A protein has these predicted regions:
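Topology signature of small-to-medium multi-pass alpha-helical membrane proteins
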Residues: 2-147
C-alpha cells in the first residue's frame, strides 16, 4: 500500500516560518551585541556622576538581557523548524514564546531603554507577525490536517 500524500504546505506557513526565523536571527545578533558590549564597554563611556556600582548594575543588566535574547532566539529558531513540519504542539509553544518575548522586550524598552539593543528591538516585529500568521485560519486548517 502506498502512503497517503500529506497536504501541501500553504504559503502562509512558509512566510510565517521565514519571518520568525528572521526575527530569531535579529534576536541572536542583538543578544550577542548586548553581551559583548556589556563586557567591552569602558568606564569612561558613562557619566562621571554615576557610581561604579551603578555602572556595574547597568552592564550586568545589559549582559543579562542580551543572554535572554540569545536564548530566546535559539528557542524560536528550534520551534520554527519543528512548526514548519506541521507539529501542532510546537506551533502553540512558538506562539506563547513569541507573546512572552514581545511583552518582555516592550516592557524593557519602556523601563530600561539602555538595556535593549536595536537588533533585538527590531527582531520582535517579524516574530510577532510570524506568530500571528501561524495562527491564521489558513495555517490552522493545515496544522489540523497534519495531525
Amino acid at each position: 500500500m502506498t502512503q497517503p500524500i500529506p497536504p501541501q504546505r500553504p504559503t502562509i506557513v512558509n512566510i510565517a516560518f521565514w519571518l520568525v526565523l528572521l526575527g530569531a536571527v535579529l534576536l541572536l545578533a542583538g543578544g550577542l551585541l548586548g553581551v559583548t558590549s556589556a563586557f567591552t564597554t569602558p568606564r569612561s563611556a558613562f557619566a562621571d556622576d554615576l557610581s561604579d556600582s551603578a555602572v556595574h548594575s547597568i552592564l550586568v543588566m545589559r549582559a543579562g538581557i542580551g543572554a535572554i535574547c540569545l536564548l530566546t532566539g535559539m528557542g524560536l529558531s528550534f520551534l520554527a523548524g519543528r512548526t514548519r513540519n506541521g507539529d501542532l504542539r510546537f506551533r502553540r509553544s512558538l506562539v506563547w514564546l513569541s507573546v512572552a518575548l514581545v511583552v518582555l522586550v516592550f516592557v524593557l524598552a519602556l523601563l530600561a531603554p539602555f538595556a535593549i539593543t536595536l537588533p533585538a528591538l527590531f527582531g520582535v516585529v517579524p516574530v510577532a507577525i510570524g506568530a500571528t500568521l501561524f495562527m491564521r485560519p489558513a495555517s490552522s486548517d493545515w496544522f489540523q490536517d497534519m495531525q
